[in-house]
Amino acid sequence: MSASSGDYREVAPPGPLAASLVCTWAQTVGARAQRVLPDGCADILWIGEDAPVVVGPATGVTLAALPPGTIIAGARFRPGRIAAWLSLATDELTDRLTPLADLWRDADALTARILAEATPDARRAAIAAALLDRAPQARPPDPLVAAAIGWLARQPRGRVADLPALVGLGERQLRRRFQVAVGYEPKRFARILRLQRLLALAERAPAGRGRLAALALAAGYADQAHMARECTALTGLAPGALLPGAASALALTDFFKTA
């Protein structure tokens, strides 16, 4: 994170939570509003002293602007995993903020436990501990959707049209199960996954002539023009404007850890 965005720290989840969580994280908000890019994940967040919310998977960019000094702490769930922890289909959370109290009866007690901690990292650690306590109540994820997510993550040029045969479901049935688990249909998820792959590759790619064209192909786009259209559609920025600042995005997720 850049200093003007605030101090931001991610911590890998403890072993029993690794299949469900990308990380727990905490941030003290800085002076600059922040672009949060779609990543297919859902978060449970405690923002300042407010009641916690579930932030559903996003279909586009969000501009987050909070008072400087606000403490945010939360847990980021892997694509397709939060539905196992909630009695609600993920597509009912997409592009929404849902009060956690609407979904967990003990949300108030959980909040008292977390907000008793004064520092961002202590709140983050309290969230991890609370989820560890709750883990036995989580249902298993949909195994066929998990297989589809894993295949898309491993195949930069994988075709969504091939998924039904690969997982043994009809197209309509797979689409519905995918929406329930992930929050949107496989094609949209593949687009977001490709964007996140591009961001991850851009962090390591050397500067030089032909960089954008090479990144486009490595990330799974048909060509540089395809990459430009998709970046603009999903983030509001062309690749040349987006990629230099990729490391300052909140939602840089390692999709390739598909436990």
Indicate where each model-derived feature is located.
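Alpha-helical bundle regulatory/interaction domains
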Residues: M1-D162, L166-E171, A181-P186, A200-A222, ...
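A glycine-rich, hydrophobic loop/mini-helix early in the fold
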Residues: T235
